[in-house]
């Protein structure tokens, strides 16, 4: 499959938010099965139940609420996907009602793109600061890199030369946090660096840390700071 990743894009002119991956994708039949047949059974009730309270409770982004929570902020959602299987790509469109449209797509590369057509009362989801906040809050340690725009970095290519500024991908998350690595591979400075990543506004270093790496009678990994 190769290196997997996700990219998030904002198109303010079109008022759309794009989430793109290069995963295994879906066939048209899989879209019908997993997006329509399964999800529609509880989608209408879910949307009606949380329509008024979603902003106050911060319900967007909570685990397990599913794909259809996107209609809380979007008037229309599109899925353009191509499976790793040798089958045509599919383009699914829905406005949140039980009606949907699915047709073939010209997409050639494997993966899925979800396009949210952001509603008028949810324009803040077209702001970079808002999306950055959400990505950091809910996807900070996802196992695959998440790109959101670009950023400028300063490098010094050779000794004695002037610093040079380059544009690189802005990777929001840390796919390999400290707790996923064996303690033998980490130094004290690595733990302190990870602590600063977790708590950027905490200026004092922790007194000490405990790296949990248990595999019996259950699996448990983590880092405790004190």
Please tell me what each predicted stretch does.
Residues 1-125, 133, 140, 153:
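GHKL (Bergerat-fold) ATPase N-terminal catalytic module, capturing the glycine-rich phosphate-binding loop
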Residues 59, 77-99, 119-122, 129-226:
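GHKL/Bergerat-fold ATPase module in large chromosome/replication-associated machines
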């Amino acid at each position: 499959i190769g290196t997997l990743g996700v990219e998030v894009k904002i198109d303010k002119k079109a008022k759309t938010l794009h989430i793109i991956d290069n995963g295994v994708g879906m066939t048209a039949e899989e879209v019908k099965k997993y997006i329509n047949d399964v999800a529609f059974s509880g989608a209408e009730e879910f949307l009606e139940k949380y329509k008024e309270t979603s902003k106050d409770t911060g319900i967007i982004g909570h685990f397990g609420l599913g794909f259809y929570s996107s209609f809380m902020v979007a008037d229309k959602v599109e899925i353009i996907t191509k499976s790793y299987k040798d089958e045509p790509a599919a383009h699914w469109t829905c406005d949140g009602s039980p009606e949907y449209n699915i047709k073939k797509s010209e997409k050639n590369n494997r993966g899925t793109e979800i396009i949210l057509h952001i509603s008028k009362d949810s324009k803040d989801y077209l702001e970079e600061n808002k999306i950055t906040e959400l990505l950091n809050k809910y996807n900070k340690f996802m196992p695959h890199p998440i790109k959101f725009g670009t950023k400028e970095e300063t490098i010094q290519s050779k000794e004695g030369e002037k610093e040079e500024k380059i544009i690189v991908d802005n990777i929001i998350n840390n796919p390999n946090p400290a707790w996923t690595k064996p303690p033998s591979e980490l130094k004290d400075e690595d733990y302190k660096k990870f602590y600063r990543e977790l708590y950027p506004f905490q200026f004092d270093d922790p007194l000490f840390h405990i790296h949990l790496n248990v595999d019996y009678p259950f699996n448990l990994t983590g880092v405790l700071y004190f």
